[in-house]
Amino acid sequence: MRDSSVLHFERVSVSGNFQFSFDDVAIVSIVACDAPNIVTSDEVDARLAPFYERVGAEPGLLQNLAGITEHRQWPEDVGFIEASALAGEKAIVESGIDRSRIGFITNTSVCRDRLEPSSAVTVHNRLGLSSHCINYDISNACLGFINGIHMAGTFIEAGQIDYALVVDGEGTREIQQNTIDRLLDESSTIDDLFSNFASLTLGSGSAAAVIGRHSENPGSHRVVRGDFRAASQHHNLCVGSLESMRTDTKALLDSGTELGKVAWDEADKDAWGDMDRYIFHQISRVHAGAMIDILGIDPERVPMTFPTYGNIGPAAVPFTLAKEVPSLKAGDRVLCVGVGSGLNASFVELAW
């Protein structure tokens, strides 16, 4: 007889990708905002010098292993919400639309100052959006922005709104200071460096996109279709807060690339094997190389921003895409690719 005080769950064995397609959804504008303060990896190593000497470790992991030479930070008076609003304003201006037509705004940032209210509601206020504009956060680790585009497209395709604004603002000052302080503590070990290493690879920045109907916005870029896939058995491999980020680096790399390959094999990989650009979530040289190899794609078509910006979380994909816009031409086919903590994988096809 089962104990009624204990919940029992049955595992579902059905496997597969979640797939979607849109007929008339497009990116009207997409922008990136650089955090202005540059922090080099050499500067981080200099701060960690007492730790390296004490545990007998060599500096240079950020550059030699992760391939990150520098990252950015916001000034102390610029918070996550301000960073999101900065990108949102820029995206609205570049889109050329009247902001009163925006019917949905979502903030997809990992970084947040509070549990409630949402970050989106403050960005809504800062940008002077209408009272009919739905506003809430979407939180899904580094895939949040891609989920935001999908949600926006769903609203538009259903005829419920005309335009949506997806924003994201990330900052690293607090978590990296906490990580360095923790490593400089006399009790820290080399194992602490490896379990906290991911927090040192993070970068600050913001991004935003206005989403609308392709038919109503000449020169916009279609959101064609996409795939999502979950492997939630790996939800403990990367767990983060503003205080710290604990990561099983090898297991995360192995499980993430495995999930990416399984999702790729079930998606339309033949059609996606020869895209003009692949916009990856930006983590490190090791992660990018592993995904390029396992998907069998041309590395020359994979632009990288992590060497000089670090991993900007959910902002990384739109940030990198926005940086790539000057080199894209009408007719180019673009695939956004991401694996986020949880684990979840995503592929979203764009027609430029």
Show which residues each predicted segment covers.
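Condensing-enzyme catalytic core mediating Claisen C-C bond formation in acyl metabolism
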Residues: 2-77, 185-254, 339, 351-352
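Claisen-condensing/thiolase-fold acyl-transfer catalytic domains that form or cleave C-C bonds
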Residues: 7-11, 15, 85, 111-113, ...
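Short beta-strand segments
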Residues: 28-31, 139, 164-170, 211, ...
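Short, well-ordered amphipathic alpha-helical segments that serve as non-catalytic structural scaffolds
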Residues: 54-58, 81-95, 255-270, 320-324
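Glycine/charged-rich beta-loop-alpha catalytic/anionic-binding loops adjacent to active sites
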Residues: 69, 101-106, 127-138, 187-194, ...
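Short glycine-rich phosphate-binding loop at a beta-alpha junction
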Residues: 100-108, 273-281
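Acyl-CoA/ACP chain-elongation machinery
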Residues: 160-179, 232-235
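Oxyanion-binding "anion nests"
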Residues: 237-278
